[in-house]
Amino acid sequence: NYKDRYMLTGTFRADGSSRFTNDKWGYFPSIAAAWTVTNEKFMKNQKLFSEIKIRASYGLIGNQDITPYSTLGLMGSTSFNYGTDTNYTGYWASGLATPDLTWEKVKQLDLGIDLGFFDNRLTVSLDYYDKKTSDALLQQTAANYLGGTKYWVNAGEVSNKGLDISISGRILQNKE
């Protein structure tokens, strides 16, 4: 924060997860900046706005919400006796190996402006967002001849874009 006009923040995360076999680490940076225009000298004599703040942020986050050990190839067993006193053990693939499964990644850009009127008794916020999910974690089912088991894959991308508008008013306000 510089002179209550310019704000800048950033983070960097390195997250490790034992839920993934080969690609355990995900790296997730983010940055945000804001400019309070009404705190500039050239805005001091205007009376219309009590606040103008322009905001922008960009970040990357990860998702590792899968069942532990689900990237390993696992075997299941059961016993059959075929109508006799002797039990025979049968095996099947109860979990297919997916060693290259990796973090689901979400990239998001936000651009916004906050406007205040009448000593901030009326405020308006406009926000544009663009959110893209890649390497989405999806559980699929193997064919029956492979055991019919479920396994995780990185499949697909999702994109969301939109505009959020918020209007707030403080009709009654005590002077404190």
Each model region followed by its residue ranges:
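Extracellular/periplasmic, surface-exposed regions of secreted and cell-surface proteins
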Residues: N1-E176
